[in-house]
């Protein structure tokens, strides 16, 4: 049977009606998408304008702009959902009209077509979701880069130099008596020398309440995010155990390797991170990833053991646990102390490993970095078969720049081992050690024995042209990317 419709069959009429209804739905969706794009464009324009405002309002304004962008994204999702609903409604109406006119024999065919349309729509939705996630990530990265660039642009060279240091409260004040309370004297020093981080030790800890108050005050006294760190690998040597404020002994790395495995490593990371977060810390210089090569070495006493592959798996899982508790992990020490011996009393620490030997130990550090470690601590080991002299790795371009930066492609924070060690200050002046570390490619100088002389050494090196401000800005960019990442939604 044929209908009088310009020679068209009933089937052709149904197809044209479906096409018309779908085009109408797509036009509605396109119009909403255009409005959404305009809204997002306005949000991004507001963000860019905000970042260029005066320094005192930059971070707060950036946060407000991000909130506006998030609101726009929510409106986007709602609009897309509404458009999809209208499209489905239009398709349903077309389906009903077809069903009313169709003969019973046509129903299975129409049902199959509709199912194919649903499948195509689901596939398109998944693709659109992936594209949205990618776009959001790119937007977040752009926001973070702008925040970091804005922060650095507003800093004086004195502030920039101070931000390279991660020191104890005693070093900041220039005293030797352990600081157990943080008050006006620390506040004044932090205002004068806005260091990048404060590291605490057992001597700073007298009670759980006092420690929490100290860490809280340190953050209050700083205008910018402050790294507050400690070295805690778990076990009986934890500063929380030795200071007497905790009886909760978390598994040591040696215990993890001997009996607990990857699950135990992750659990230990979670426990360490939870305890650190309880007191307000945000950095743990752990795990110790060195491969043990000699009996009696620090790697043998406190590390995971002699097998690089096992160390890599366990280090990765400890870092995952710490990261899941919002603690920045600082994997240490590269190159490892696994076969090192010290010359005399407090002399240099020597390893006879070659470049090929060292490559066999890369995995634990690289796995920890891949798992989210934000710091890589460079040891004071001297490698004469690699360098040709006894200059420590912490001051060595061959180690930090050639291997870590260029060969590994690592662009996170490189921090020195504690610089108050005799193998450093007996061989180099405080200024020489600080400048040498930055020249070699390090970003932060940890626990210098004399902060004032080290800090002034950096400033003098800039004035003389030995260090450029651009070189310092490279390190600050890495530092502030870590500090500000949590402030950027979606990063």
PLM-predicted stretches and their roles:
Residues 166, 199, 284-285, 330, ...:
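Conserved beta-strand positions in the central sheet of alpha/beta enzyme cores
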Residues 249-319, 323:
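A substrate-binding/cap region within the structured catalytic cores of diverse enzymes
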């Amino acid at each position: 049977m044929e209908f009088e419709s310009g020679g068209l069959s009933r089937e052709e009429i149904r197809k044209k009606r479906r096409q018309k209804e779908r085009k109408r739905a797509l036009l509605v969706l396109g119009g909403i998408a255009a409005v959404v794009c305009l809204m997002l464009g306005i949000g991004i324009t507001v963000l860019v304008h905000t970042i260029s405002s005066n320094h005192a309002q930059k971070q707060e304004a950036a946060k407000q702009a991000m909130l506006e962008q998030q609101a726009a994204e929510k409106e986007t999702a709602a609009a897309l959902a509404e458009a999809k609903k209208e499209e489905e409604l239009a398709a349903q109406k077309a389906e009903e009209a077809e069903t009313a006119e169709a003969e019973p024999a046509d129903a299975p065919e129409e049902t199959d077509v509709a199912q194919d349309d649903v499948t195509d729509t689901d596939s398109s939705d998944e693709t659109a979701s992936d594209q949205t996630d990618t776009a959001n990530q790119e937007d977040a990265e752009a926001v973070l880069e702008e925040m970091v660039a804005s922060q650095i642009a507003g800093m004086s060279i004195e502030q920039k130099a101070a931000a390279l240091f991660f020191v104890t409260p005693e070093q900041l004040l220039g005293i030797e008596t352990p600081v157990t309370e943080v008050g006006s004297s620390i506040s004044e020093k932090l205002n004068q020398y806005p260091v990048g981080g404060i590291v605490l030790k057992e001597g700073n800890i007298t009670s759980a309440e006092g420690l929490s108050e100290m860490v809280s005050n340190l953050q209050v006294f700083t205008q910018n995010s402050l790294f507050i760190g400690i070295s805690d690998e778990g076990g009986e040597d934890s500063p929380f155990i030795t200071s007497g404020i905790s009886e909760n002994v978390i598994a040591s790395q040696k215990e993890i390797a001997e009996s607990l495995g990857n699950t135990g490593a992750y659990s230990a990371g979670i426990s360490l991170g939870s305890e650190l977060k309880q007191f307000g810390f945000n950095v743990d210089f752990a795990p110790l990833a060195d491969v043990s090569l000699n009996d009696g070495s620090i790697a043998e006493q406190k590390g995971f053991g002699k097998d690089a592959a096992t160390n890599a798996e366990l280090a990765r899982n400890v870092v995952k646990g710490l990261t899941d508790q919002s603690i920045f992990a600082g994997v240490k020490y590269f190159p490892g102390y696994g076969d090192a011996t010290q010359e005399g009393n407090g002399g240099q620490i020597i390893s006879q490993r070659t470049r090929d030997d060292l490559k066999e130990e890369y995995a634990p550090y690289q796995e920890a970095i891949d798992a989210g470690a934000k710091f890589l601590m460079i040891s004071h080991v001297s490698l004469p078969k690699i360098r040709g002299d006894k200059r420590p790795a912490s001051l060595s371009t061959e180690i930090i720049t050639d291997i870590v930066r260029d060969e590994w492609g690592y662009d996170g924070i490189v921090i020195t081992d504690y610089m108050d060690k005799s193998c450093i200050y007996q061989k180099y002046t405080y200024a020489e050690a600080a400048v040498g570390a930055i020249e070699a490619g390090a970003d932060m100088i940890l626990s210098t024995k004399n902060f004032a002389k080290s800090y002034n050494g950096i400033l003098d090196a800039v004035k003389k042209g030995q260090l450029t401000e651009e070189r310092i800005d490279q390190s600050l960019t890495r530092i502030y990317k870590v500090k500000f990442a949590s402030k950027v939604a979606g990063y």
